[in-house]
UniProtKB/Swiss-Prot annotation:
It catalyses: D-ribitol 5-phosphate + CTP + H(+) = CDP-L-ribitol + diphosphate. GO terms for molecular function: 2-C-methyl-D-erythritol 4-phosphate cytidylyltransferase activity; D-ribitol-5-phosphate cytidylyltransferase activity. This is Ribitol-5-phosphate cytidylyltransferase. Pathway: Cell wall biogenesis; poly(ribitol phosphate) teichoic acid biosynthesis. The lineage of its organism: Bacteria, Bacillati, Bacillota, Bacilli, Bacillales.
Length: 237
């Protein structure tokens, strides 16, 4: 089976003085997360679409889904975990409980606050994860990347041609991700907050899928202004 998992577990601390997590803030009068969910609903390859939400916001998540989308049997709201990877695993535990996990089952995970992903990005993630087992969505680095080990002085300037900026979706063969995650110590789980890094450090090849510059993550007030500008431009076309 092919699952989508929309990660809406963040609290939005970088958004400033707002009274709700950033995924629920309005983007052209509709919550950001609704724009994201709709992109996945448009793809009929998904058997289930999981939305992972903070416990205290589960009812709100269900309410806005009902208001803006209506009934869809593919949609399921699941309680998130203490961090990103634990939220991914919360969704996987739900899948295991309800459907069991087959060796060829895959999951396409995506930030709820990246509302501008495209049908191409989703389809290429599905195709690539079915073939390779682990996938990351990236764009080429435009600016020079500076590395500093002490946050005071330059330690290294990597060759920009080899540098990429990570986006989402990140996609995985479920059985392999579970196997690798369960091998981690508590200390490793606290440090390895990116699921693709878990795969890479274990020697698994992670296939790259080309993202888009406009596939932005809305985490700050400035990002929200940019997102509104992108949306208004599309509406006016």
């Amino acid at each position: 089976m092919i699952y989508a998992e929309i990660l809406a577990g963040g609290k939005g601390s970088r958004m400033g003085n707002v009274n709700m997590p950033k995924q629920f803030l309005p983007l052209n009068k509709r919550p950001i997360i609704i724009h994201t969910v709709e992109k996945f609903l448009l793809n009929d390859r998904f058997d289930k679409i999981l939305i992972v939400s903070p416990k205290e916001w589960i009812n709100h998540t269900k309410d806005i889904l009902k208001k803006f989308i209506g009934q869809d049997d593919r949609l399921v709201v699941v309680e998130g975990g203490s961090d990103r990877n634990e939220s991914i695993m919360s969704g996987i535990r739900y899948i295991e409980k309800e459907f069991g996990i087959q060796d060829n089952d895959v999951i396409i995970t995506h930030d709820s606050v990246r509302p501008f992903l495209t049908h191409r990005i989703i389809d290429e993630n599905i195709d690539a994860v079915l073939q390779y087992g682990a996938v990351d969505t990236v764009i080429s680095a435009i600016d020079t990347i500076i590395a500093s080990e002490d946050q005071e002085f330059i330690s290294d300037i990597p060759v920009r041609d080899n540098m990429y900026q990570g986006q989402t979706p990140q996609s995985f063969r479920i059985s392999k991700l579970v196997e690798l995650y369960n091998k981690l110590s508590d200390e490793q789980k606290a440090v390895l907050t990116d699921a693709c890094k878990i795969c890479s450090l274990a020697g698994e090849k992670v296939k790259l899928v080309r993202g888009e510059v406009f596939n932005i993550k809305v985490t700050t007030p400035y990002d929200l202004k940019v997102a509104n500008a992108i949306l208004q431009e599309r509406i006016s076309q």
